[in-house]
């Protein structure tokens, strides 16, 4: 992936999401008669600044990791008598709640807009047809077979593997029954299968829901002919060349690239013997595999790839919506992803999901770059998901976040008077500690994935 895509994708993502979030606060504050002193995108040294006719200073700062809206407030500085009514602290509790809630709400509205555009643009999806089912796996025990096409998971229709994965992610760490409706191969007959779950993937790092059921999606065969080599990878170091065809690994014949991938991933750090066909001659090559990940996520890495192949037209479907249908899709996806984000947080707190699944700025930058390089639709999807995460996280009742301020104002509304400044200060200290701790944990997780 190009570093340029990563940098540009990250800057665009943060710039758009932060600006929209802060604009929510700004717009409602203005409507409530609060004087806004500064609207800043980023922190630190201002790179660009200007003032509008209301005296608000607009700033684009050097560190693009957030932003803020500074409002007139007697608690922060002395306010001239003629401006007292424009102070944030002089507004009613309802007005203050509206101003604070407007930021996260803006993020949800932005996600709806992005999902609406994606639905209008349409996408080409691979039909979720099962390629193979591992013996004795959860899928095999439920009676699922190769050639069946998944139609719905837990009653939710699915049109592609992304939809399947989303529905499975919702069940991580749970016990019970997963209902899968499929269409039998070569017929229009539907059947429903019950997959038994028992603390499914509870606490697992980087879970792969589809693979863990024992399902491998159908895909065209890929001959194991090398078309890509990592200049610093084990394959290059061992002397493999573009055009080499792998015939066996440790004496086990391979005729499809997926066999190579499975074999390599299962041997992290091991030395393997390859038989390679090159220019009509069979060569023996010893190769020491690298290691990616840690713990249960450890896997072997070879540093080689093959060329893609054309998918049969019957295995692809175009999915798009009209303007009104797209609105429904956008609302539904935003609601679903918001609930999924909240559910994931709950499961992490209960230990049903590993905290190692938390991602920080490095992972965000990588995904931003990859999605930007992949196309407009993928990048807009990424922005929508990130905007939802920003909205949900900001609504958590943790002092220092918008949700913490909302909690204070709700308590004030119920009590008829605000909490003491000492209690609020304690809350802020606790909130800052929690937020910094989570940010450090996410950064450590990012670094462990490098």
From Swiss-Prot:
It is a multi-pass membrane protein. GO terms for molecular function: metal ion binding; metalloendopeptidase activity. The active site is at residue 22. It is an enzyme of class 3 (hydrolase). It is found in: Cell inner membrane. Zn(2+) binds at residues 21, 25. Keywords: Cell inner membrane, Cell membrane, Hydrolase, Membrane, Metal-binding, Metalloprotease, Protease, Transmembrane, Transmembrane helix, Zinc. Its cofactor is Zn(2+). One of its GO terms (cellular component) is plasma membrane. Its main location: membrane. This is Putative zinc metalloprotease PA3649. It comes from Pseudomonas aeruginosa (strain ATCC 15692 / DSM 22644 / CIP 104116 / JCM 14847 / LMG 12228 / 1C / PRS 101 / PAO1).
